[in-house]
Amino acid sequence: MATIPSYLSWVPKTGTGNAQIKINSVNPYTGRVNRSTQVSGKIVGKDNTVTVTVLEKAADEFITPDGLTINVAKGGETIHVTGKSNSKLLTFTWKTNFGIENVTSFKVNGSTTATSGTAITGDPGATGKYTYDATIVVPKNNIIEARSATLEIKGEGSTVVKTITITQALGDSYLYLNSQGTTTATVTIPKGGGEQTLNVLSNDEWTFEPAE
């Protein structure tokens, strides 16, 4: 005889004579497909049996991010876009970007690798919510302005969409001569004169004529 599963609340489980049994989901069912469970009952010590079918209605498709904004240090770092969903597939698309690579894959329930825009193996969302984790490498910010990128996460349904905003702090100002990291240079003007070129590399306003 099948036992009452842990996801169902069933009170009481035993009794004598006429009674009412209260049946409910322990937690709201989150799968996209109805869940049907059969539970058998019997008279103690005899062969009389009954069967109850409990039908938990499917939940709407959803995506629930753990957060809608992520702040990133100016030096760049690896971040994780995480949340929960019951969608058959998830598609990650940059709506605005500043050079971050496309999100082509992500982890489901911490172990299964899924491909953006492709049905997830085993369709875990059919029977309940799952976790997703997309790893994103944000490069160093070399400009002196904060910058933002927006990542859209879309499910199978056209209205199942969430947008994540990633904001990176402004980078440091720099001033180099002829090559990155070089702060000194010698310019030699030949005998008789002759224009020479000094290459300036910077991301900020600079001057070689300081104010007095």
Each model region followed by its residue ranges:
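Surface-exposed binding patches on compact interaction domains or structured appendages
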Residues: 1-22, 62, 67, 87-135, ...
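Surface-exposed, short loops/turns at beta-strand junctions within beta-sandwich domains
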Residues: 26-34, 126-130, 138-146
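Extracellular and select intracellular beta-sandwich modules with Ser/Thr-enriched
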Residues: 46-53, 147, 158-165
